[in-house]
Amino acid sequence: MSLMVVSMACVGFFLLQGAWTHEGGQDKPLLSAWPSAVVPRGGHVTLLCRSRLGFTIFSLYKEDGVPVPELYNKIFWKSILMGPVTPAHAGTYRCRGSHPRSPIEWSAPSNPLVIVVTGLFGKPSLSAQPGPTVRTGENVTLSCSSRSSFDMYHLSREGRAHEPRLPAVPSVDGTFQADFPLGPATHGGTYTCFSSLHDSPYEWSDPSDPLLVSVTGNSSSSSSSPTEPSSKTGIRRHLHILIGTSVAIILFIILFFFLLHCCCSNKKNAAVMDQEPAGDRTVNREDSDDQDPQEVTYAQLDHCVFTQTKITSPSQRPKTPPTDTTMYMELPNAKPRSLSPAHKHHSQALRGSSRETTALSQNRVASSHVPAAGI
């Protein structure tokens, strides 16, 4: 039984630990950007650092790229506004949390957050093959190209945070391009693309002109597209977190009620064991009462008064014979006590004299009923 309890507790702990890890961990905060981590040059972005452990003081630092003096170990309360951004702001950021009562103790670092600064190079061009309007189920390919020798292209869809990227490949017409296959089209959307260099991966060009992809035979032209595996993966990940947390909570509830049931059972067993000796004593007392006979002592009192009687004739005698009155008195029950030999002898003597007295009394009564001879 104890092994099952330990197993349930371990399963719940690891499930809950896995769920917490996806959201930033047990003792580290979660860092995010609003409205987006892709910021145009000269724009502003708000960095939010949140924690489940009640941290109210946060420290922000940059891991790579050019250091930003005003952000070096910056202390802030939950959020900080960064901007106007420059190429120096591009890079990877983390934050730490602390309590006001212990400002020198900091939590583990948060998840990494990449800030991308755009508008540093000329914009590329974006096109769709076979065209921007396709039928449902038809394969679509988006091509991002530029005459500049960029190393990487990034495809962005409106309303989606993750941007897939592909390396640039020289084409026959002297341009550098990357082809993004979307697969069978089911939904449309608005797309743009960016270009970047290897030595500055977080400094992007201006966005291309937006391209609207329409899918005929579907009423929702701006819904999710076939290039949404990342968003679906995010949904599955959050669903996994929700399921894991729910299972852990259910296991802890079951464990709580199981321990409560065991505690109540132990208390009931202890109460029954405490009552058993008292019950045995009651039964023994009743058995002793049943074994001891209820002794009742009767004392017969003779009310015959030996007085001088007058002999009368039989005709004057009462027709109803005299009735001897006997009175009984029940004495309280008492356990018989052992008598000493002297007491036993005295009791036997009293019984003998009592029998003699009773016999003498009966003889006298009988003689009083004998008819007298006529004179």
Curated annotation (Swiss-Prot):
Q: Which residues lie on this side of the membrane: Extracellular?
A: 22-238
> What is the name attached to this protein's record?
Killer cell immunoglobulin-like receptor 2DL5B
Question: Biased-composition ranges for Polar residues?
Answer: 355-366
Q: Name one GO cellular component term.
A: plasma membrane
Where is there biased composition of kind Low complexity? 219-231
Q: Which residues lie on this side of the membrane: Cytoplasmic?
A: 260-375
Check the UniProt entry and state the signal peptide residues, or none.
1-21
Keyword set includes Ribosomal protein: no
SMART domains, A to Z: IG (SM00409)
What are the annotated glycosylation sites?
A: 218
Residues forming coiled coils:
none
Q: Where in the cell is it found?
A: Cell membrane
Q: Which domain of life is it from?
A: Eukaryota
Residues of the Ig-like C2-type domain: 42-102, 137-200
Taxonomy, top ranks, is:
Eukaryota, Metazoa, Chordata, Craniata, Vertebrata
Q: Name one GO biological process term.
A: immune response-regulating signaling pathway
Transmembrane regions? 239-259
Task: Name the family.
Answer: Belongs to the immunoglobulin superfamily.
Pfam families, sorted? ig
What functional role does this protein have? Receptor on natural killer (NK) cells for HLA-C alleles. Inhibits the activity of NK cells thus preventing cell lysis.
Topology relative to the membrane, per the entry? Single-pass type I membrane protein
Q: Which SUPFAM superfamilies match?
A: Immunoglobulin
InterPro entries per the record? Ig-like_dom_sf (IPR036179), Ig-like_fold (IPR013783), Ig-like_Receptors_ImmuneReg (IPR050412), Ig_sub (IPR003599), Immunoglobulin_dom (IPR013151)
- Region entry Disordered: which residue ranges? 213-233, 334-375
